[in-house]
UniProtKB/Swiss-Prot annotation:
PROSITE patterns: DEAD_ATP_HELICASE, HELICASE_ATP_BIND_1, HELICASE_CTER, Q_MOTIF. Keywords: ATP-binding, Helicase, Hydrolase, Nucleotide-binding, Nucleus, Ribosome biogenesis, RNA-binding, rRNA processing. Residues 57-227 form the Helicase ATP-binding domain. This is ATP-dependent RNA helicase FAL1. A motif (DEAD box) lies at residues 175-178. Gene3D superfamilies: P-loop containing nucleotide triphosphate hydrolases. Its main location: nucleus. It is an enzyme of class 3 (hydrolase). Transmembrane segments: none annotated. SUPFAM superfamilies: P-loop containing nucleoside triphosphate hydrolases. It holds the Pfam family DEAD.
Length: 399
């Protein structure tokens, strides 16, 4: 199911200023959605709209530019997917909606959510991502895809090759907008936007919306509806957060080895800041006879797919990764996240540890810190208004 966690949802508080004129819909029926879409929503396992869904879906359907802020676990993917599916004309084969995501995995996952929600609607949707054969994209697009979910590089390439016609696109969705804007996709998004018809509806969805993102999206949007979460609710409830003080960087490895038995109780993700570090740590763990798998952005797509598949099915239990994994990928069993390195970008902290409390499961996040990292840890605490306690001696007490 989409990234929905009822505990997290119940904790959400929206900024009164941003939502005061927005009607809250307590049921999907009250939205007057197409019957086939409603069947897809219930078939997918939703019973009632989440907090963000009850506010944002109807704004999207009304055609207004919309900026919706909601963290992992709130059903935000389904929010824009439902809004989009309601306005799609299934009789036309033309591309009518374009979703842009910062990672291939997220683009594929969104396509899967759209497919499931649109199960009874005969909707054609395609994931247009790098790392796959261009010929396959061209073939699929020629067959007619009403919804395209993709990464900016491949999408702009398909538009320039004239394989993706933009004249009937009525909605552009930017998912994880903060990541799209800050990780070098800004120019490609501007370029894509220039190819779209004037007056195209823009929907911006993200867990964190910095002032910079709001300024940039201001260039695309006209008088947007803003549905914003209060800043102090942005960290995930239900995640216990700890730090372990390590005398020096080299000692982090021994600390991790001591924790390994606890890691494999369920499944764990270990985050490093660079692919070099991911490869180094993976080699060290394997040399010490620990079973781990690794993933980072430089791997070929089929290799990443295979690793993700093994991890999803539980064949592998410990994944070492860079932030490429931190956004939008659902693995239900993950209940422990270890930050071997603290994230260089404070806003990525919520994306990393947000993995571990999905689907109402309580999670644990452990941060390994040296003296040099202490200031960074304090910055994270201030940013999210949280306290990251020192880890108890017996790790099993917290699992």
């Amino acid at each position: 199911m989409d990234d929905f966690d009822r505990d997290v949802d119940n904790e959400l508080e929206f900024s009164a200023k941003s939502t005061k004129n927005i009607k809250v819909h307590a049921t999907f029926e009250s939205m007057n959605l197409k019957t086939d879409l409603l069947k897809g929503i219930y078939g997918y396992g939703f019973e009632a709209p989440s907090a963000i869904q009850s506010r944002a879906i109807m704004q999207i359907i009304s055609g207004k530019d919309t900026i919706a802020q909601a963290q992992s676990g709130t059903g935000k993917t389904a929010t824009f997917s439902i809004g989009m599916l309601e306005v799609i004309d299934t009789k036309s084969k033309d591309c009518q909606a374009l979703i842009l995501s910062p990672t291939r995995e997220l683009a594929q996952q969104i396509q899967s959510v759209v497919k499931h929600l649109g199960d009874y609607m005969n909707v054609h949707t395609h994931a247009c991502i790098g790392g796959t054969h261009v010929g396959e994209d061209i073939k699929k697009l020629q067959q007619g895809q009403q919804i395209v979910s993709g990464t900016p590089g491949r999408v702009v390439d398909m538009i320039k090759r004239r394989n993706l016609a933009t004249r009937n696109i009525k909605m552009m969705i930017l998912d994880e907008a903060d990541e799209l804007m800050t990780k070098g996709f800004k120019e490609q998004i501007y370029e894509i936007y220039r190819y779209l018809p004037p007056g195209v509806q823009v929907v911006v969805v993200s867990a964190t919306l910095s002032r910079e993102v709001l300024e940039v999206t201001g260039k695309f949007t006209t008088d947007p509806v803003k549905i914003l979460v209060k800043r102090d609710d942005i960290t995930l409830e239900g995640i216990k957060q700890y730090h372990i003080q390590c005398e020096k960087e080299d000692w982090k490895f021994d600390t991790l080895c001591d924790l390994y038995d606890s890691l494999t109780i369920t499944q764990a993700v270990i985050f490093c800041n660079t692919k070099v570090k991911v490869n180094w740590l993976t080699d060290q763990m394997k040399k010490a006879n620990f079973t781990v798998v690794a993933m980072h952005g430089d791997m070929k797509q089929d290799e990443r797919d295979s690793i993700m598949n093994d991890f999803r099915t539980g064949n592998s239990r410990v994944l070492i990764s860079t932030d490429v994994w931190a956004r939008g990928i659902d693995v239900q069993q993950v209940s422990l996240v270890i930050n071997y390195d603290l994230p260089t970008d404070k806003e990525n902290y919520v994306h990393r540890i947000g993995r571990s409390g999905r689907f109402g499961r309580k999670g644990v996040a452990i941060n390994l810190v040296t003296k040099e990292d202490v200031d960074e840890l304090r910055d994270i605490e201030r940013f999210y208004r949280i306290r990251i306690k020192e880890m108890p001696v017996n790790v099993n007490d917290i699992m």
